[in-house]
């Protein structure tokens, strides 16, 4: 009887593991399909121009290898490529990355890309001169940035903060708390930081350097 109960427990535990894995795979597949559908248009969903914070501060960044996380259609990564950086972009959407290459061609530069599910991705240590991540919120990924940078490397992060909830229907978990970027990257030297609110949208931006 005891052996039978143990077998039942093992079977139940295995079933739960399989169910959890299947649910996770389904969720990630659904994210991929959702973004592929969004990007499946001739128009660039977020435009072709880089974010102003990046343009204003590009002269501060060390030249070298850039990792553009959640690259999307490539507006920021392609801009950095035009400024002489070696850019590799990661995103869950193959459709978005295909548009990134088209944008790069129009700007007479080349980029590398890879379709990756960032929710299960681990950054290699001491690899990048710059890590760029805009309008993608994954706190556990942010915590890998410092170790993934080469000494003296920099991160550029910009995304919506809690004040954005005043202007749009937006999940609270995807919005930064007050000073959250400063807290996450407190082990790094802050080069630039801003909180922006124009009455229509609100976001926070940071450039920080690994010692």
Where are these regions (language model features)?
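Conserved SAM/SAH-binding beta-strand->alpha-helix loop
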Residues: 93-95
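A short, conserved alpha-helix within the catalytic core of class I
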Residues: 137-149
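Core SAM-dependent methyltransferase catalytic element
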Residues: 196-211
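A short acidic, Gly/Pro-enriched loop at the edge of an enzyme's catalytic core
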Residues: 121-130
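Conserved SAM-binding motif I beta-strand of class I
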Residues: 86-91
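Conserved class I S-adenosyl-L-methionine
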Residues: 64-72
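Conserved SAM-binding strand-loop segment of SAM-dependent methyltransferases
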Residues: 107-118
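Conserved beta-strand signature within the Rossmann-like core of class I S-adenosyl-L-methionine
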Residues: 153-164
């Amino acid at each position: 009887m005891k052996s039978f109960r143990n077998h039942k427990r093992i079977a139940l535990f295995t079933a739960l593991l399989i169910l959890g894995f299947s649910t996770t795979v389904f969720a990630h597949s659904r994210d991929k399909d959702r973004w592929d559908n969004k990007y499946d248009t001739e128009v660039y969903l977020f435009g072709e121009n880089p974010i102003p914070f990046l343009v204003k501060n590009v002269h501060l960044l060390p030249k070298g290898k850039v990792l553009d996380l959640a690259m999307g259609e490539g507006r920021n990564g392609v801009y950095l490529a035009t400024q002489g950086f070696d850019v590799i972009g990661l995103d869950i959407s193959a459709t978005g990355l295909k548009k990134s290459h088209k944008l790069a061609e129009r700007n007479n530069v080349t980029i590398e890309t890879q379709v990756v599910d960032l929710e299960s991705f681990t950054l290699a240590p001491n690899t990048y001169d710059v890590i760029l991540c805009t309008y993608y919120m994954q706190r556990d990924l942010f915590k890998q940035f410092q170790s993934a940078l080469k000494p003296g490397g920099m991160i550029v992060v910009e995304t919506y903060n809690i004040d954005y909830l005043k202007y749009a229907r937006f999940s609270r978990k995807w919005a930064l708390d007050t000073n959250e970027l400063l807290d996450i990257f407190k082990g790094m030297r802050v080069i630039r930081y801003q909180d922006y609110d124009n009455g229509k949208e609100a976001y926070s931006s940071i450039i920080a350097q690994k010692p």
